[in-house]
């Protein structure tokens, strides 16, 4: 058996050397204690150095956000299941302000307000992390909104156009089609995405706040069937989630979108809906014992929405020229747009589309009330062809609504009023559009050219939509060059208008109304109608000559 060659002195020297070279890793950890917990709110003692909006770690890996920094304790919102958090448990500071992962890999995914995937498709490889509370672009970092963002909805693109970088509010009662308008807008970006041109491509973020799981699933299914999930991210805070998740969801979606905007990309974000976020923030504030204001909302509820929506912008060219377009949704009660939250958001945004219950029930869908809806960007966000054909549309519809109310009580109407009523009824029918069927802008121009140009006056109201559909099918097959010219030049030249008029006239000859009657106007009847209209206008505008009597002739002036 071999003898040991290591002596006791060698062992002693090795131990002494190791002990002398050992340096203990010491770190300072600030730990607090849960004083009370309930309704997703916890009060914690013993964290004197905590920052506002800092993440706190509760037992079991559950996170919370420090909101109230009081003298003796910290009020924190728990993000997740608070049932297992008990009084006396330890809480650790993380040293990190609330942030979420961002990057290209988020397209096509469904995440929660912490940026964690919830679609069962594995982890997401993030490019970076972005803080939720960041300063919005300043005045010098912005430029004016001048590029159109087509929604594919005729009534919006014609009368309340939206530009890239704009904030357009979609407001109305429940079940009036607010979500449908925004989903159609996302679907309409597919053609731009498939073009492969970064200047045309628009990435989309859909933020669902307090929605039912089935509602979010149906939206996702509609986007998948329309080929829109390739460029869309869904941030979901379910109705069953805590108030903290509903409060944070819009900021998470905005952070993901801002990452692309500052990278020079164009982004569209939908907040569905901010009413539920305000209600969640009200619940959090009341539980934290913050003083309530109007309708029990806290005093900073305006700032809650303004600092979110101010992030939507069209960046200056030296910052890449990216844009973030916002479509916030607000739900009203009994069409009351003068309530607290609706008026707040109306004052923050650049316009609103007001959807009305009565119009929706009459079958006018999208149920946009033209009189109340407005876009403060206006013609700057429209192509020239759309300006030409839709210039008089809002006025025509407003006059039609006034005459319609008057005609309900008047038995006898002059020819001009009857013509306006007939034209208005056809315009209303023309602006109706099925859900999930957005229309390219060049086809919208042709459709509106039909209505405002009077080409539908001889078509029965019940056949207007069929006439429009069949004419567009005919043009796609036989007159593709008209669509191509409008799409590429973005203008409707006199030559294009003349050729389009000839196409419509020839198409009318082969089109039969529901009863089998021809829609080609009789030239003789049309001339008589024109003469009748002229006479009516003469009656209105011509001065009536004063009748002079013999007595007046002989009388001398004083």
From Swiss-Prot:
Entry-linked InterPro entries: ATP_synth_asu-like_sf, ATP_synth_asu_C, ATP_synth_asu_C_sf, ATP_synth_F1_a_nt-bd_dom, ATP_synth_F1_asu, ATPase_a/bsu_AS, ATPase_F1/V1/A1_a/bsu_N, ATPase_F1/V1/A1_a/bsu_N_sf
Membrane topology: Peripheral membrane protein
One Pfam family cited in the UniProt record for this chain: ATP-synt_ab_N
UniProt keyword Zinc-finger present: no
Enzyme Commission number, as recorded: 7.1.2.2
Keywords on record: ATP synthesis, ATP-binding, Cell membrane, CF(1), Hydrogen ion transport, Ion transport, Membrane, Nucleotide-binding, Translocase, Transport
Reaction catalysis annotation: ATP + H2O + 4 H(+)(in) = ADP + phosphate + 5 H(+)(out)
Span list, region Disordered: 536-558
GO molecular function: ADP binding; ATP binding; proton-transporting ATP synthase activity, rotational mechanism
Site-annotated residues for Required for activity: 373
Segments of skewed composition (Basic and acidic residues): 548-558
Ligand binding (ATP): 172-179
CDD domains: ATP-synt_F1_alpha_C, ATP-synt_F1_alpha_N, F1-ATPase_alpha_CD
GO cellular component, one term: plasma membrane
Family that this chain belongs to: Belongs to the ATPase alpha/beta chains family.
NCBIfam families xrefs: atpA, PRK13343.1
Functional description taken from the UniProt entry: Produces ATP from ADP in the presence of a proton gradient across the membrane. The alpha chain is a regulatory subunit.
UniProt subunit comment: F-type ATPases have 2 components, CF(1) - the catalytic core - and CF(0) - the membrane proton channel. CF(1) has five subunits: alpha(3), beta(3), gamma(1), delta(1), epsilon(1). CF(0) has three main subunits: a(1), b(2) and c(9-12). The alpha and beta chains form an alternating ring which encloses part of the gamma chain. CF(1) is attached to CF(0) by a central stalk formed by the gamma and epsilon chains, while a peripheral stalk is formed by the delta and b chains.
Protein name: ATP synthase subunit alpha
């Amino acid at each position: 058996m071999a003898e040991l060659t290591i002596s006791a002195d060698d062992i002693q020297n090795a131990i002494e050397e190791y002990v002398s070279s050992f340096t203990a890793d010491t770190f300072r950890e600030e730990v607090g204690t849960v004083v009370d917990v309930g309704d997703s709110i916890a009060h914690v003692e013993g964290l004197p150095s905590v920052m506002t909006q800092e993440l706190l770690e509760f037992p079991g890996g559950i996170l919370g956000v420090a909101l109230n920094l009081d003298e003796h304790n910290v009020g924190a919102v728990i993000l997740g299941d608070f049932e297992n958090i008990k009084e006396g448990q330890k809480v650790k500071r993380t040293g990190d302000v609330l942030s979420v992962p961002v990057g290209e890999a988020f397209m096509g995914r469904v995440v929660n307000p912490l940026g964690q995937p919830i679609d069962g498709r594995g982890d997401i490889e993030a490019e970076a992390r972005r803080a939720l509370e960041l300063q919005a672009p300043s005045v010098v970092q912005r430029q004016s909104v001048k590029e159109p963002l087509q929604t594919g909805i005729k009534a919006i693109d014609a009368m309340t156009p939206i530009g890239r970088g704009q904030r357009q509010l979609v407001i109305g009662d429940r079940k009036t089609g607010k979500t449908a308008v925004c989903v159609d807008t996302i679907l309409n970006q597919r053609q731009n995405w498939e073009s492969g041109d970064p200047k045309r491509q628009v990435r989309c973020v859909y933020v669902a706040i307090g929605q039912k799981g089935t509602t979010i699933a149906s939206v996702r299914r509609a986007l998948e069937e329309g080929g829109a999930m390739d460029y869309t991210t869904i941030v979901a805070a379910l109705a069953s989630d805590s108030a903290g998740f509903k409060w944070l969801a819009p900021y998470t979606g905005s952070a993901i979108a801002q990452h692309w905007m500052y990278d020079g990309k164009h982004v569209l974000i939908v907040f569905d809906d901010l009413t539920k976020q305000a209600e969640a923030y009200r619940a959090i504030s009341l539980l934290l014992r913050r003083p309530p204001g109007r309708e029990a909302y806290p005093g900073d509820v305006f700032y809650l929405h303004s600092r979110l929506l101010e992030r939507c912008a069209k960046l200056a060219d030296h910052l890449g020229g990216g844009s973030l377009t916002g479509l916030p949704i607000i739900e009203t009660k009994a069409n009351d747009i003068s309530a607290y939250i609706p008026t707040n958001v109306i004052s923050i945004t650049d316009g609103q589309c007001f959807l009305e219950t009565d119009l929706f029930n009459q079958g006018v869908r999208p149920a946009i009330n033209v009189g109340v809806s407005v876009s403060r960007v206006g013609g700057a966000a429209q192509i020239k062809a759309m300006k030409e054909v839709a210039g008089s549309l809002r006025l025509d519809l407003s006059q039609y609504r006034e005459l319609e109310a008057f005609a309900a009580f008047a038995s006898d109407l002059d020819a001009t009023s009857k013509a306006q009523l007939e034209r208005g009824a056809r315009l209303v029918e023309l602006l109706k559009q099925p859900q999930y069927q957005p229309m390219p802008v060049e086809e919208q121009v042709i459709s509106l050219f039909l209505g405002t140009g009077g080409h539908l006056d001889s078509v029965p109201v019940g056949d207007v939509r069929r006439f429009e559909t069949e004419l567009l099918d005919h043009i796609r097959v036989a007159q593709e060059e008209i669509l191509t010219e409008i799409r590429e030049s973005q203008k409707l030249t006199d030559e294009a208008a003349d050729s389009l008029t000839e196409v419509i006239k020839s198409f009318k000859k082969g089109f039969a109304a529901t009863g089998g009657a021809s829609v080609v106007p009789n030239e003789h009847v049309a001339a008589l109608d024109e003469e009748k209209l002229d006479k009516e206008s003469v009656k209105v505008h011509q001065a009536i000559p004063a009748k002079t009597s013999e007595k007046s002739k002989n009388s001398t002036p004083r």
